[in-house]
């Protein structure tokens, strides 16, 4: 891994909730799904690490713990933020949060492991 990554470094990603990211509660109300929220959070963490990876390295998810706090309907924007909280050699811990246009909709922690691509 390249030098320079530090605790506090963060990255963000946004998406507009579409029919691709929803689940229907009780079959009628389409809302942003928990797996889609986690996917966005993980990709924000990956984005935070990307500039520090060597050409032969990749980061993979090793752990995720998330609370989904509020429902978000189709057509609303969601923003995920991943902030580095700890660095232990090849293990990077993140605080992950998600917000829609109204409120915080998710929070949790995520760990990524930096691996050599030849070991996949």
Model-derived regions, located:
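Generic structural detector for well-ordered beta-strands
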Residues: 12-18, 67, 109-113
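Short, residue-level hotspots on alpha-helical faces of the histone-fold
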Residues: 39-43, 47
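Hydrophobic beta-strand-centered segment that forms part of the acyl-chain substrate-binding groove
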Residues: 46-79
């Amino acid at each position: 891994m390249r030098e320079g990554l530090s605790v506090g470094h963060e990255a963000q990603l946004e998406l507009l909730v579409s029919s691709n990211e929803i689940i229907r509660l009780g079959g009628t109300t389409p809302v942003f799904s928990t797996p889609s929220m986690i996917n966005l959070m993980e990709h924000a963490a990956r984005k935070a690490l990307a500039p520090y990876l060597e050409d032969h390295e990749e980061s993979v998810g090793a752990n995720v713990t998330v609370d989904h706090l509020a429902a978000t309907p189709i057509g609303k924007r969601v923003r995920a933020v991943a902030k580095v909280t700890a660095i232990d050699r090849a293990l990077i811990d993140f605080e992950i949060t998600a917000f829609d246009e109204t409120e915080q909709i998710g929070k949790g922690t995520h760990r990524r492991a930096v691996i050599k691509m030849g070991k996949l």
